[in-house]
Amino acid sequence: MRGGTVLLILILLLGVIARSPMTALAAASILALSYLGWGGLLEWIEQNGVDTGLIMLTLAMLAPFATGKVGLREVLLSFASLPGIIAVIGGVLATNLNKRGIDLLSGEPQIIVGMIVGSLLGIVLFGGIPVGPLMAGGLTALILQIYGWLSK
């Protein structure tokens, strides 16, 4: 058994134990594609998966506008409130962290295993919700940068 297969099986098991269906399903899907010999699809997922996932997430965030659950009035009112202004600042900070996460993951893809384990521990110990590796990667990059500053 290849090392990558062993890691995927471990991630699958951790996902099941931690009751994280997204993690378990992702690991099981990649294992299945690998065993079916669908290397081309695996390569496509590796190259385009993050962008495709972000598109799906953005679609989910924009859907309330199309369904009429959120209108222009609500959006404008949110910008006039303290929570709305803080939400804009939070969005700016989050996108910056997410970019750092993508940069870290593309430069050091092996770090994803630690982030997955950390995410699963967050689910089990703190009732967290796994939203993917970007925020975990961004926070990891920020912590590594702070560590770099402090260790000089």
From Swiss-Prot:
This is UPF0756 membrane protein Helmi_09930. GO terms for cellular component: plasma membrane. Signal peptide: none annotated. Keywords: Cell membrane, Membrane, Transmembrane, Transmembrane helix. The keyword Oxidoreductase does not apply. Belongs to the UPF0756 family. The chain crosses the membrane at residues 6-26, 52-72, 75-95, 111-131, 132-152. Its main location: membrane. InterPro entries: UPF0756_TM. The keyword Zinc does not apply. Disulfide bonds: none annotated. It is found in: Cell membrane. It is a multi-pass membrane protein.
